[in-house]
Regions:
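Gram-negative (and chloroplast) outer-membrane scaffold detector with strong preference
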Residues: 21-23, 28, 36-42, 66-140, ...
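A broad helix-preferring feature
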Residues: 15, 154-156, 200-202
Length: 209
């Protein structure tokens, strides 16, 4: 999955260069953002076909990018791509399904952002989004099986604060919650129905142009 970060970097960097060399903009205009963070998949059901089990997970890294448009000083929209990763501690009683492994997802969402105007460089904001899991996969150990799903409906809520470091650069810190419905992980003759909820914190750099 991490190889998919390269096209996003190639897209964001030229936009950032344009932003840094441009004139100061008003309250509306386009933006590009790059994020890194840390988060955890919530423990929950990870049910084999015809049975039930629960999964326990450890935190992992997050990374992502977004292209947005500020309609005015209060409202904006963005297309967001975020990669989330973490470790599997156990699935099933005593790790009967898996006692280690990796669990990761790529989510694509369209977000609506509401900002609270202040007479300072600080910009508190909240947002909500709807989209899908471009990919979610679990590598189960010690069996070595890999199961995955694509296209599951996903929804997102976020809240954060931005600091306007210059006319064209804003630094953001935000918390995010992502949930997904009807995740069905299949592969190598195995099938699972899983809950997927993830909570994380991300640091971002947003270029305004």
């Amino acid at each position: 999955m991490q190889r998919k970060l390269l096209p996003l970097a190639l897209l964001i960097l030229p936009l950032a260069a344009c932003a840094s060399s441009g004139e100061p903009r008003g309250s509306s205009g386009f933006s590009a953002r790059a994020n890194v963070g840390y988060g955890k998949t919530s423990d929950g059901s990870f049910d084999p076909s015809g049975s039930s089990a629960s999964g326990e997970y450890s935190p992992g890294m997050m990374s992502g990018a977004a292209i947005g448009y500020d309609i005015n000083e209060r409202w904006g929209v963005e297309a967001d791509w975020t990669y989330r990763s973490g470790d599997i501690d156990s699935i099933g009683t005593g790790g009967s399904v898996a006692n280690s492994g990796d669990y990761a997802s790529v989510a694509v969402t369209g977000n609506v952002i509401h900002s609270f105007a202040t007479d300072s460089p600080w910009r508190p904001y909240i947002g909500a989004g709807l989209g899908f899991l471009q990919e979610i996969d679990a590598d189960l150990k010690p069996s070595g099986a890999e199961v995955s799903d694509r296209g599951a409906l996903a929804y997102q809520f976020l809240a954060g604060v931005g600091y306007r470091a210059s006319d064209s650069i804003e630094i953001t810190l935000e918390g995010r919650y992502l949930g997904a419905e009807d995740v069905e992980l299949t592969g190598e003759g195995q099938s699972f129905e899983a809950e997927y909820e993830h909570v994380g914190v991300m640091l971002g750099f947003r270029w305004l142009f």
